[in-house]
Amino acid sequence: MLDQGIGARVLRKEDDRHLHGRGQFVGDLAMKGLKEVAFLRSNLAHGRIRTISKPAGKEALIVTAADLKTIKPIFADSSIPGFKASNYPALATDKVRFVGECLAACIADTRAAAEDLAEEIEVDIEELPAVIDSLKARAPDAPLVHDDWSDNLFLTTSVQGDIETLAKTAPVKVTRELRTGRQCMHPMEGKGVLAYWDFQSGQLVVYTSTQVPHMIRTGLSETLGLEQRQIRVIPPDVGGGFGYKCVLQPEEIVIA
């Protein structure tokens, strides 16, 4: 075994620190006056929001989309040709589009108190037909995810070249219908966010469990209306991601 260069055994630098409990994740961070936030989420896959009623006397502790009118939605776009962009609000506005979509953020001194507060919110949602099969979602009469779209196709692409001629002259032809299941990442650490305004530097400081801090800074700048120099994103130790932590999450916008 070589001591250096290609093929050399490289010792992991972070193992000793983590094995001795010296790692620092978002959940390990603490500061004076820190509040906890719990999110009320939709239990319906598709529905139109009629009302979200806050408990009397606790309105200031609960944030809904009505309180975030100056916050821009996430603009879900791609450089891939044929991709159809859409807006993704930090908190659901007119309708919910999947189970787990954030409806409200509840602020309290402890996590338990924040979750109890979320249970006091009354939500009236008109349930709409939902579809979970991608092929059925392409049907002309399928429920629309976005009301201003004519269909549910978010990407239309094509292959260049004389495919028909090549197929006719091919010595072997194979026809297959391939399906892949839904992908879901399960890192040991879930998503965590801590944010505060640093009056000394005049910056919004965001500690977040992310794989792409610069992308998060850009996204927060676009949605919050701040210049990028006014935002500092710090990723502490990250307990796994596998791509799940490579995008801006609505919860990061709400917390910030």
Describe the role of every protein-language-model region.
Residues 1-149:
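Flexible, low-hydrophobicity surface segments
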Residues 4-11, 34-35, 65-77, 160-166, ...:
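A generic short-segment signal for beta-strand/edge and adjacent turn/coil regions
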Residues 14, 154, 232-236:
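Exposed boundary/loop context
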Residues 24, 35, 91, 101, ...:
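Short beta-strand-initiation
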Residues 24-27, 85-90, 164, 189-192, ...:
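Short hydrophobic/aromatic-rich motifs at helix boundaries and adjacent loops
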Residues 28, 168, 246-250:
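Residue-level recognition of conserved structural "scaffold" positions that shape functional pockets
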Residues 39-69, 103-125, 193-256:
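Alpha-helical support elements that line or immediately flank enzyme active sites
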Residues 76, 139-224:
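Helix-loop-helix junctions that connect adjacent transmembrane helices in secondary transporters/permeases
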